[in-house]
Swiss-Prot record:
<dbReference type="GO" id="GO:0006412">
    <property type="term" value="P:translation"/>
</dbReference>
<keyword id="KW-0689">Ribosomal protein</keyword>
<dbReference type="InterPro" id="IPR023803">
    <property type="entry name" value="Ribosomal_bS16_dom_sf"/>
</dbReference>
<dbReference type="GO" id="GO:0015935">
    <property type="term" value="C:small ribosomal subunit"/>
</dbReference>
<dbReference type="InterPro" id="IPR020592">
    <property type="entry name" value="Ribosomal_bS16_CS"/>
</dbReference>
<dbReference type="GO" id="GO:0003735">
    <property type="term" value="F:structural constituent of ribosome"/>
</dbReference>
<dbReference type="GO" id="GO:0005737">
    <property type="term" value="C:cytoplasm"/>
</dbReference>
<dbReference type="Pfam" id="PF00886">
    <property type="entry name" value="Ribosomal_S16"/>
</dbReference>
<protein>
    <recommendedName>
        <fullName>Small ribosomal subunit protein bS16</fullName>
    </recommendedName>
</protein>
<dbReference type="InterPro" id="IPR000307">
    <property type="entry name" value="Ribosomal_bS16"/>
</dbReference>
<comment type="similarity">
    <text>Belongs to the bacterial ribosomal protein bS16 family.</text>
</comment>
<keyword id="KW-0687">Ribonucleoprotein</keyword>
């Protein structure tokens, strides 16, 4: 099954997440099909904390991709802000 989920990057104690479309059998930070955005939970001030391509997310959901719990919340927040 194809899933849209977070892939953790960044340094120790400084997480940075790529939002990726990946087969659920692939490891979390490994192979992915497409990158659709990023999430920076430690963004401060004018730094961009979330960038998400809602068109591509919508496309993958139409194709049957599932959303992880955290990504579903981020998509909901991004739609509200847009």
């Amino acid at each position: 099954m194809v899933t849209i989920r977070l892939a953790r990057h960044g340094a120790k104690k400084r997480p940075f997440y790529q939002i990726v479309v990946a087969d659920s059998r692939f490891k979390a930070t490994g192979r992915y099909i497409e990158k659709v955005g990023f999430f920076n939970p430690t963004a401060q001030g004018q730094e961009e904390g979330l960038r998400l391509d809602l068109d591509r997310v919508g496309h993958w959901v139409e194709q049957g991709a599932g959303l992880s719990d955290r990504v579903a919340k981020l998509v909901k927040d991004a739609k509200k802000a847009a």
